[in-house]
């Protein structure tokens, strides 16, 4: 299918997608009941969307086009209430987090969807292993060239977004030693990681045309880069975050991304070049492995600092943009999190260290999602 023209969007409009865990108490393993839950709530959703993801244990919620994080929060809050009512009727529960700590991928069932079944045939067990849960944030752009500039600009802060959202230290019943183990699941896919280098939209059109020669890429949905342009929406989509444990934290992360996008496209602080990506995988690994304590290495100077230190610098830079966009509260909440020094991944490990079980950890996450907006 040919790549569509880039749809011009109002700059800095916002859309958020969250992949949630559908959980079956009292054992708190993943359920296979998302289809029944979606059927029960779809007529109650007035703004945004509730839909399938890859397997029957995954529930995706997505806002519509929002001007600011307050609009997104209101839409998610309404969805949350509808989902909790239906889940209660069906005796299932909902949790955030980038991975379920002890589910087995062999037990997962792919949704009855033509695209997902095609991917199961193509990728085999990799699709079932991709029963992991992420947050995606779309930011509107005026044109394709702006989208490519923004994509490269946001790529500089991929470690920050990973570390800020990291909530997947446990997988398959084990402590992975990673703050975010979720992203490792995608390493077997041919389109994992950063987008190949292009400098403008014309270059991207050529890139997509060549990718389509493989017969594995038909639409932009078939590429799973860390950040990708979405021409049909007129957005740039950031895809590296674990799903946070609360809607509030997800909203704050989206607010940071929106403010960073505004700063990047308004100030144009960087002249992007291909060598900017030479240490991309190393810095990304540091974020996945160590979270906010990970070390960033500057590709030009070799200077190193922790992600937490550099995050404080970023918050200062984007604060005026956040103020203009109505997202100052997100910056303040993230600054408070940095001051407290505890990520969601660390709080999970603390819970287990204090004698909690993985089952009780999932139970706690379900309670957290149900009681926090």
Swiss-Prot record:
The reactions it catalyses are:
L-cysteine + L-glutamate + ATP = gamma-L-glutamyl-L-cysteine + ADP + phosphate + H(+)
Q: Which InterPro entries match?
A: GCL_type2/YbdK_subfam, GCS2, Gln_synth/guanido_kin_cat_dom, YbdK
Report keywords, A-Z.
ATP-binding, Ligase, Nucleotide-binding
Any matching Pfam family = GCS2
Gene Ontology biological process terms, A to Z: modified amino acid biosynthetic process
Statement: the UniProt record of this protein carries the keyword DNA-binding: no
Q: What is its EC number?
A: 6.3.2.2
Family stated for the protein in its record: Belongs to the glutamate--cysteine ligase type 2 family. YbdK subfamily.
Q: What is this protein called?
A: Putative glutamate--cysteine ligase 2
């Amino acid at each position: 299918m040919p790549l569509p023209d880039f749809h011009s969007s109002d700059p800095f409009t916002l859309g958020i997608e969250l992949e949630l865990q559908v959980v079956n108490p009292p054992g708190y393993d993943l359920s296979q009941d998302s289809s029944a839950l979606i059927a029960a709530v779809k007529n109650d959703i007035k703004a945004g969307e509730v839909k399938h993801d890859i397997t029957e244990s995954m529930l995706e919620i997505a806002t519509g086009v929002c001007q600011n994080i307050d609009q997104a929060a209101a839409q998610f809050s309404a969805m949350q209430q509808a989902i909790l009512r239906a889940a209660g009727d069906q005796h299932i529960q909902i949790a955030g987090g980038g991975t379920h700590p002890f589910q087995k991928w062999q037990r997962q069932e792919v949704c009855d969807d033509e695209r997902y079944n095609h991917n199961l045939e193509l990728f085999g067990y990799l699709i079932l292993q991709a029963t992991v849960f992420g947050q995606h944030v779309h930011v509107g752009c005026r044109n394709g060239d702006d989208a490519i500039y923004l994509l490269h600009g946001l790529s500089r802060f991929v470690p920050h977004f990973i570390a800020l959202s990291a909530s997947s230290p446990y997988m398959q019943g084990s402590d992975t030693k990673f703050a975010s183990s979720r992203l490792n699941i995608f390493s077997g896919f041919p389109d994992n990681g950063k987008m190949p280098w292009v400098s403008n939209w014309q270059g991207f059109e050529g890139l997509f045309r060549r990718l389509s020669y493989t017969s594995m890429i038909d639409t932009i949905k078939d590429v799973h880069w860390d950040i990708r342009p979405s021409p049909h929406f007129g957005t740039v989509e950031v895809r590296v975050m674990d799903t946070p444990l609360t809607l509030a934290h997800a909203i704050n992360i989206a607010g940071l991304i929106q403010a960073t996008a505004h700063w990047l496209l308004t100030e144009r602080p960087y002249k992007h070049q291909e060598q900017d990506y030479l240490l991309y995988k190393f810095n990304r690994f540091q974020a996945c492995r160590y979270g906010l304590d990970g070390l960033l290495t500057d590709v030009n100077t070799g200077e190193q600092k922790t992600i937490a230190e550099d995050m404080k610098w970023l918050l200062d830079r984007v604060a005026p943009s956040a103020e203009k966009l109505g997202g100052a509260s997100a910056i303040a909440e993230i600054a408070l999190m940095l001051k407290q020094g505890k990520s969601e991944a660390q709080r999970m490990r603390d819970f287990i260290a204090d004698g909690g079980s993985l089952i009780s950890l999932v139970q706690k996450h379900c309670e957290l999602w149900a009681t926090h907006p």
